[in-house]
Amino acid sequence: MTTIAIFTKNVLLAIAFALFAQGAAIPDPAKRDDNPGFVALDFEVTRKPLDVNATSELSKRSSPSSPLYFEGPSYGIRVSVGSNKQEQQVVLDTGSSDFWVVDSSASCQKGNCKQYGTFDPHSSTSFKSLGSSFRSIGYGDKSSSIGTWGQDTIYLGGTSITNQRFADVTSTSVNQGILGVGRVETESANPPYDNVPITLKKQGKIKTNAYSLYLNSPGAATGTIIFGGVDNAKYSGKLIEEPLVSDRYLAVNLKSLNYNGDNSNAGFGVVVDSGTTISYLPDSIVNDLANKVGAYLEPVGLGNELYFIDCNANPQGSASFTFDNGAKITVPLSEFVLQSTANACVWGLQSSDRQNVPPILGDNFLRHAYAFQLDKETVLSRSGEVHFCLKCFSNLETSIVWKAFFYNRYIQ
């Protein structure tokens, strides 16, 4: 989910973690420190057809207009809250920064907001109310959440953090709680507070405020987020560092877009957001590519138009996104053909001009990028191909590679 003001994420297309090239030895896992400096969590992918009949997720956070809403995949992480470890599944969101859960007595304004777990603050002996009200940053589809701020112990896999600030939501039109891992500048509170990634670092669970996000293949049921590290099985070669171009959101500068040999100069900032299903770029780029693959504009109500494409279309080739420091991310054009609730498929690269939103690179791009370093305000992107191997983790601060014997399934 993304704020519209200046969507940007700290994007690092990373300096290599190639200790092998430097002759460094891999530490023996049996002698592994109890705190390797990273926290690895799997998340579950929930998929729905793209809904083109409502207002947009992209108009969140005070957008001047309401573009169309695309309810695509969401990424659910299991966390536990409180002294009695009350389990929730919350949506992982790189475009927002607050962590909130659904109260056990909450009023659900839309759907069943309690289906993924609830929190009863009265049953946790470690819960402390902070006595102030919470209201989520506004969404263009009119969804919202209200509640109160509190703090408690949060359990993330085998790791826990204490006195973490979060919101206990008592009324919501959102179907699930949210774990926002964006920058503190997009928090709902003023002044800002230490959100989950910052607390993980301050309490010594990770060595740097960074995370790598692996969305896996388009049809996969799971993905992985690693706070404080990267998975070396997910890339070859090096990671290239790209600086953020906003002091508020996770955004980098897109230099050019090449598709099947045709090059379009860009030279503008793009937001990178896991909460946005598709990608949005200016008319000058989108229209040309749409014509080449056979996508066509159709009215969809409320004065909006969208690009659709025949669901049987199988556009060949790829789109390559090049950034300022030379990072190049290649996405197969076939991944831009997305099922929807309409009679045709939605083309996954829409016009930011027509939708009146900033340029955004969503899930169909992020799947091919990799890591975010919030401390250094950069994004890390993988270069080269991904190979089958056991998952090997690198601490982003020390670049020491651990063979993760405790996490031993092969990449699929």
Swiss-Prot record:
O-glycosylated. It catalyses: Preferential cleavage at the carboxyl of hydrophobic amino acids, but fails to cleave 15-Leu-|-Tyr-16, 16-Tyr-|-Leu-17 and 24-Phe-|-Phe-25 of insulin B chain. Activates trypsinogen, and degrades keratin. Residues 75-383 form the Peptidase A1 domain. Disulfide bonds join 108-113, 311-345. The active site is at residues 93, 273. Residues 26-61 form a propeptide. It is found in: Secreted. InterPro entries: Aspartic_peptidase_A1 (IPR001461), Aspartic_peptidase_AS (IPR001969), PEPTIDASE_A1 (IPR033121), Peptidase_aspartic_dom_sf (IPR021109), SAP-like (IPR033876). One of its GO terms (molecular function) is aspartic-type endopeptidase activity. The keyword Nucleus does not apply. The keyword Lipoprotein does not apply. GO terms for biological process: proteolysis. Glycans are attached at residue 53. Keywords: Aspartyl protease, Cleavage on pair of basic residues, Disulfide bond, Glycoprotein, Hydrolase, Protease, Secreted, Signal, Zymogen. Its main location: secreted. GO terms for cellular component: extracellular region. Its EC number is 3.4.23.24. Residues 1-25 form the signal peptide. Belongs to the peptidase A1 family. PANTHER family: ASPARTIC-TYPE ENDOPEPTIDASE, BETA-SITE APP-CLEAVING ENZYME, ISOFORM A-RELATED. This is Candidapepsin-2. It comes from Candida parapsilosis.
